[in-house]
Amino acid sequence: FDDAVSRDEDVGKHASDTLRYIENTLVPWLHSRYGDVPCVVGGYSLGGLFALWASCKTDLFVGVAAVSPSVWIKNWTVFAENNHTHAKSVYLSLGDREEHARNQRMAAVGPCIRRQHELLLQQLSAEHTVLEWNKGGHFDDEAGRMARGFVWNVDY
């Protein structure tokens, strides 16, 4: 529970349920319809954090597109240091103004994303991960940045 995200204690408690749905229902349906295609998981903000977390919990995803992921959340860095990704490629993206937020917890995203990238470089190498800095803040060009994350993984 992190009250910087929400005062609702249920926020974040259903990530395992979501991953189980993806593993047991969504991906089998996709494979039955389109064949054994590789899967990339991605998300924005808390969704980006979910994508990083999910890649540590299962080997289902070949790639991750984590755009403005909430890596500043309490205990994330400890988790990331102790749980390696199973993905073959990871795209990280952050707006260059995000680490200058007034909220000190959210401003920690700069050092936290740099640490996340360092960990991924150790795990995957520079060829298999990238940290792309974009102009603007957290809410600038979300769709374009997400698209670039998926394209990077597909082109990888």
Which role fits each region the language model picked out?
Residues 65-67:
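A short, hydrophobic beta-strand element of the alpha/beta-hydrolase
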Residues 53-62:
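Conserved hydrolase catalytic core segment
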Residues 42-47, 51:
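Gly/Ala-rich beta-loop-alpha elbow adjacent to hydrolase catalytic centers
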Residues 145-156:
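Catalytic active-site module of serine/aspartate enzymes centered on a nucleophile-bearing elbow/loop
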